[in-house]
């Protein structure tokens, strides 16, 4: 079936009007060209054309071979019409060889194919995507001839038959209308001077490997190019061909089988090398990645590790390998030096490891996320298969591209690299360094580009011997090894911890695989690596200094590899530094990039001049990337002798850390503020917001009563920080400046940290309120002696009036005159002057100051009015300040036992939850009132008064050999009485409280005579203390209500029986052994290891979770110093253990 005359006229008219409307500028540009006989193309989008007229689309899909010549004629008519309508005709020149090129077909299975077409597609116009594997020479094709009838001299034009390889078949009979029936013709065109010729070329395309399923062999087909399409592509290009599927065969012979083949007659070719396949990069995508790096601007290494964790996530750990693969995929910047020589920007990586170490997994993943990649194995690769081969086809020699040529501009992955034969491996030397392949085969001399990154994997030759060189272990020549920028060694050494963690990782992924939300998808990774290749980072001066100094050190090393430590090493360092800057999404190579590259190079077998090689298999992701980088800076820059750069880099890290902590504090404060708005009423919301504004600065610690609510901002502290502060207090290492200010070491460090958080949503907790009701500085003592600072939740239904009633006992007897307020400057910031006093009772160790509290003569009503907008401070004499300093420094101060502190400070109802209801609070008040009545009743007893009078004359005798003696406190008390101090009011209830504490501690000290019993008692007490601290910390971590554990429930410090007072007169103090006291103090320092909450698998934590990343003296990364406790994955046993501790 063919198109009729009317259909041809319709198609011509519609296409001519369409071209004049949409492509008028292109026609004008073609007509301005000088060459008249050249071929010119006009690219037309098929979607736009079909939308203009659907009937054209139907004709085009049904009869493409007939419609395309009509399009060319209509284009010439449109050019003629434009030329006639143009006023300046002298600037244009009419062209005859115009061709309409159709592109942009609708994406549907009928028109778009990713695989080679089959027989059913013959006669259809399709778009086929593939890779050019062979290009033939350009030929001259005679497409038509003229034949003249010998009888009537009629001339007949015959076109070459495409289906029979462009052969000419003379006419059978004369077609003259006058009725000439002659069958003899003479060809007018001579073979030496053909009349009608055009350029002709055949190429061979192959299906793209990444679009095939596993095990499928890629098929290929011939594509015919004519006219201006000739030489539009080369071997290795990814192209999309738009054309008509046709079949052709050679001339038929008797008793010969017809050789039929399917070819694609191209109408247009689009080269896709510059455009990544399946990757769309627009402003929205760029904004997404920019927001990601803005989030990690203060800790960019953590953002980089998140990207590395998404690289080949099925392989556990191997941090160094993943970082090296990511840098190789990112690549460096290609440049041309002053001599005109092109310096490659692509890096090469060789993975050397034992079988089963995950080398092939990295190769497969890298090939997937790279748009243009080739994956091959060395066992089946030859020199011709890797580079280029010469093939004879149809009597002529053609060149077929190999793996390296096909991967031009992409990635070539070669597995089992050592399986390639020796003479075949030498053929890729030029491809790796000069990135070209020079060919002189079968009379063909040419040079092909191989601008590719090579990622190879190999096994060592037998057992890897660390004493031998890498060339001997791998059986590769030094010239080939020196062309690899990195050579990482993965040794499967015997490590039970590593085997346990790998097995648990694999079994979990097999049993219940789940995808982490934090990991990037493969499409996102593919888009990101395509995006960062557009960055062109420049080297900074600091990075140049580090790389040059390291290169010089490598050259001076006694154990250097002469084949490696050439100028290629310096170029490799530059390329890898630029690649790391690309990964970090920067356009400048900084000191951070240079330090990271030197660390990777030291882990590679190409380095090792500073610290020696590292087994990259057992390296893990660091818990704190900033701390690990800090250690790398201190180690490497110190070895390189760059102290100035080290100081600058450490200062930069400090700034980043402070900014990061500031932002986190502001975020937490904002979260607390939102929580207050939900819970409190409107009036309380206003007070909370005003107080938050006053206390939100990170450098200030506020203590005051604002409005009707008390706010204390307690700094957050880790276990390690608290351990250090306790050690500092016990050793007495307090600076003179801190002694002059009278502030404890813990409090000062808390003030300097700046990352404070409002306690219990900004309000004073109930425990602290209860401790402060004895008119002492107990709230400040808790800041000094606290081990774990639980942050409690705000109670529900808490109103301003109730808070005012609870705070009122704190302020009724304290100094509240405005003149008593005093603010001093501490460390360059305005701080509230906190004065700490120490009492003389041996049991309290300065914890109770009720005997020396300055009372205020004002009434409670007045205090209630004055406390609305004032800050409450308590002042004591200078003598008491000096006593406190002596107690902190350990001068003549009795030892402090943890159990005594808990006994003294534990209130009557300390076990009541902090989120108790108003009924419980009222019941607690009634219990306190009853206790006070009972204490007053005992004081009024005359026998009790007599015993108190006797007790006033009681004193301990000082023992010369004792370290922890109560005599020091007695002397301190006597000295305090001699000092000129105003007379203070002391109530009987306060005396009883102090005497009760004294009796309790004396009873405990008397038990120390029996050595074995005391030792058991100390061990049990220390265990209880550790359990209490751990349970408090876990409850604080999980944001649960905090319950204080009573260690001595039967002992009440507020009540002292008469029999106990009578025994005091006959009491004789016997000291505990000195070594026992030392063991006790040492045991009290033991803190539980905190288990951070979250969904993170515990078996993944390869390193102890400390404040700094633990590293060996010669290790730049976290290696296999594993802890059995952290690698334990028996979660059921751990949960049961936590439940037992909690109960």
Curated annotation (Swiss-Prot):
State the organism of origin.
Xenopus laevis
Taken from the UniProt entry, a GO cellular component term is: MCM complex
The yes or no answer to whether the keyword DNA-binding is present is yes
Q: Which family does it belong to?
A: Belongs to the MCM family.
Name the GO terms of the biological process aspect.
DNA damage response; DNA replication; double-strand break repair via homologous recombination; regulation of DNA-templated DNA replication initiation
Please give the subunit comment from the record.
Answer: Component of the MCM8-MCM9 complex, which forms a hexamer composed of mcm8 and mcm9. Interacts with cdt1.
An example Pfam family from this entry, by short name, is MCM_OB
Q: Which Gene3D superfamilies match?
A: 2.20.28.10, Nucleic acid-binding proteins, P-loop containing nucleotide triphosphate hydrolases
Asked if the keyword DNA damage belongs to this entry, the reply reads yes
Compositionally biased, Polar residues: which spans?
A: 736-756, 851-860, 895-905
The MCM domain extends over 301-506
Q: Which GO terms describe its molecular function?
A: ATP binding; ATP hydrolysis activity; single-stranded DNA binding; single-stranded DNA helicase activity
Q: What is this protein called?
A: DNA helicase MCM9
Q: Which domain of life is it from?
A: Eukaryota
- Ranges for the region named Disordered are 721-767, 838-864, 895-915, 998-1022
Q: What class of enzyme is it?
A: hydrolase
Gene designation per UniProt? mcm9
């Amino acid at each position: 079936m063919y198109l009729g005359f009317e259909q041809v006229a319709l198609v011509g008219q519609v296409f001519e009007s369409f071209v004049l409307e949409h492509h008028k500028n292109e026609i004008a540009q073609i007509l301005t060209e000088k060459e008249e006989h050249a071929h010119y193309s006009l690219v037309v989008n098929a979607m736009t054309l079909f939308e203009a007229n659907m009937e054209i689309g139907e004709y085009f899909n049904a009869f493409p071979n007939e419609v395309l010549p009509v399009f060319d004629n209509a284009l010439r008519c449109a050019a003629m019409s434009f030329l006639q309508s143009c006023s300046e005709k002298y600037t244009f020149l009419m062209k005859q060889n115009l061709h309409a090129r159709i592109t942009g077909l609708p994406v549907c299975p009928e028109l778009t194919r990713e695989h080679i077409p089959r027989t059913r597609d013959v006669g259809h116009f399709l778009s086929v995507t593939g890779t050019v594997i062979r290009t033939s020479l350009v030929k001259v094709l005679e497409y038509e001839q003229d034949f003249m009838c010998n009888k009537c001299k009629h001339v007949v034009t015959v076109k070459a038959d495409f289906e029979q390889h462009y052969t000419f078949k003379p006419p059978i009979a004369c077609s003259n209308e006058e009725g000439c029936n002659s069958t003899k013709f003479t060809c007018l065109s001579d073979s030496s001077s053909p009349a009608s010729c055009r350029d002709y070329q055949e190429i061979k395309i192959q299906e793209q490997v990444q679009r095939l399923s596993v095990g499928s062999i890629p098929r290929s087909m011939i594509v015919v190019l004519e006219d201006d399409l000739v030489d539009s592509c080369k071997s290795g290009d990814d192209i999309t061909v738009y054309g008509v599927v046709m079949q052709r065969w050679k001339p038929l012979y008797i008793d010969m089988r017809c050789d039929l083949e399917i070819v694609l007659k191209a109408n247009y070719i689009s080269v896709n090398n510059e455009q990544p396949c399946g990757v769309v990069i627009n402003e929205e995508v760029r904004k997404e990645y920019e927001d990601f790096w803005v989030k990690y601007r203060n800790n960019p290494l953590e953002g980089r590790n998140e990207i590395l964790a998404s690289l080949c996530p099925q392989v556990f750990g191997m941090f160094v390998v993943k970082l090296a693969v990511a840098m190789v995929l990112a690549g460096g910047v290609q440049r041309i030096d002053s001599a005109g020589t092109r310096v490659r920007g692509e890096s090469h990586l060789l993975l050397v490891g034992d079988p089963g170490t995950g080398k092939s997994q990295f190769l497969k993943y890298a090939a997937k996320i790279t748009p243009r990649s080739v994956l091959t194995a060395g066992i089946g690769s030859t020199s011709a298969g890797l580079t280029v081969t010469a093939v004879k086809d149809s009597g002529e020699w053609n060149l077929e591209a190999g793996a390296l040529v096909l991967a031009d501009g992409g990635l070539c992955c070669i597995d089992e690299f050592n399986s390639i034969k020796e003479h075949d491996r030498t053929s890729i030397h030029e491809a790796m360094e000069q990135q070209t392949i020079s060919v002189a085969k079968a009379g063909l001399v040419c040079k092909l580009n191989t601008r590719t990154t090579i990622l190879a994997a190999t096994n060592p030759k037998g057992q890897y011997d660390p004493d031998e060189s890498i060339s001997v272990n791998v059986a590769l020549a030094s010239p080939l090894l020196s062309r690899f920028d990195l050579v990482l060694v993965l040794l499967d050494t015997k490590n039970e911890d590593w085997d346990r963690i790998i097995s648990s990782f694999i079994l979990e992924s097999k049993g219940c695989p789940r995808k982490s939300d934090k990991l990037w998808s493969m499409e996102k990774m593919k888009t990101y690596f395509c995006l960062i290749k557009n960055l062109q980072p420049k080297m900074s001066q600091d990075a140049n200094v580090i790389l040059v100094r390291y290169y010089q050190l490598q050259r001076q090393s006694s154990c250097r590899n002469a084949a490696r430590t050439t100028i290629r090493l310096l170029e490799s360092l530059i390329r890898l530094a630029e690649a790391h800057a690309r990964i970090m999404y920067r356009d400048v190579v900084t000191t951070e990039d240079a330090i990271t590259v030197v660390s990777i190079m030291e882990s590679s077998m190409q380095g090792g001049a500073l610290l020696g090689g590292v087994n990259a298999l057992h390296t893990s992701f660091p818990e704190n990337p900033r701390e690990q980088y800090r250690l790398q800076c201190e180690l490497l820059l110190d070895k390189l002798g760059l102290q100035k750069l080290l100081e600058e880099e450490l200062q930069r890290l400090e700034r980043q850390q402070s900014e990061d902590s500031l932002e986190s504090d502001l975020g937490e404060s904002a979260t607390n503020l939102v929580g207050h708005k939900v819970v409190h009423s409107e009036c309380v919301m206003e007070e909370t917001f005003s107080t938050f504004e006053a206390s939100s600065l990170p450098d200030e610690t506020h203590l005051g009563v604002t409005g009707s609510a008390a706010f204390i901002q307690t700094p957050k502290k880790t276990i390690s920080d608290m351990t250090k502060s306790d050690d500092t207090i016990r050793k007495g290492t307090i600076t003179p400046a801190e002694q002059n200010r009278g502030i404890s070491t813990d409090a000062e460090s808390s003030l300097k940290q700046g990352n404070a958080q409002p306690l219990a949503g900004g309000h004073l907790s109930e425990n602290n309120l209860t401790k402060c009701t004895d008119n002492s500085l107990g709230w400040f003592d808790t800041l000094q002696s606290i081990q774990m600072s639980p942050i409690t939740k705000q109670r529900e239904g808490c109103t301003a009036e109730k808070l005012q009633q609870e705070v009122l006992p704190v302020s009724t007897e304290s100094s509240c005159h405005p003149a008593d307020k005093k603010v001093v400057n501490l460390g360059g910031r305005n701080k509230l002057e906190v004065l700490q006093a120490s009492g003389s009772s041996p049991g309290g160790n300065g914890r109770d100051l009720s005997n020396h509290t300055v009372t205020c003569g004002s009434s409670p009503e007045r205090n209630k009015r004055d406390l609305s907008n004032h800050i409450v401070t308590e002042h004591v004499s200078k003598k008491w300040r000096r006593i406190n300093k002596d107690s902190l420094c350990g001068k003549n101060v009795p030892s402090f036992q943890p159990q005594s502190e808990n006994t003294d400070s534990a209130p009557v109802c300390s076990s009541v939850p902090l989120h108790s209801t108003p009924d419980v609070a009222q019941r607690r008040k009634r219990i306190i009132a009853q206790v006070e009545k009972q204490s007053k009743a005992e004081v009024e007893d005359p026998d009790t008064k007599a015993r108190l009078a006797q007790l006033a004359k009681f004193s301990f005798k000082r023992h010369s050999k004792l370290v922890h003696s109560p005599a020091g406190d007695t002397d301190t008390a006597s000295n305090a009485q001699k000092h000129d101090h105003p007379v203070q009011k002391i109530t009987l209830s306060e005396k009883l409280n102090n005497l009760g504490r004294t009796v309790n501690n004396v009873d405990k000290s008397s038990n120390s005579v029996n050595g074995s019993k005391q030792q058991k008692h100390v061990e049990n007490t220390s265990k209880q203390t550790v359990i209490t601290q751990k349970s408090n910390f876990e409850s604080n971590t999980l944001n649960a209500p905090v319950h204080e554990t009573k260690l001595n429930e039967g002992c009440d410090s507020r009540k002292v029986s008469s029999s106990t007072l009578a025994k005091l007169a006959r009491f004789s103090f016997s000291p505990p052994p000195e070594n026992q006291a030392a063991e006790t103090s040492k045991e009290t320092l033991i803190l539980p290891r905190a288990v951070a909450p979250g969904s993170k698998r515990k078996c993944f934590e390869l390193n102890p979770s400390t404040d700094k990343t633990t590293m060996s003296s010669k290790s730049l990364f976290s290696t296999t110093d594993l802890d059995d406790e952290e690698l334990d994955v028996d979660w059921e046993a751990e949960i049961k253990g936590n439940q037992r501790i909690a109960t």
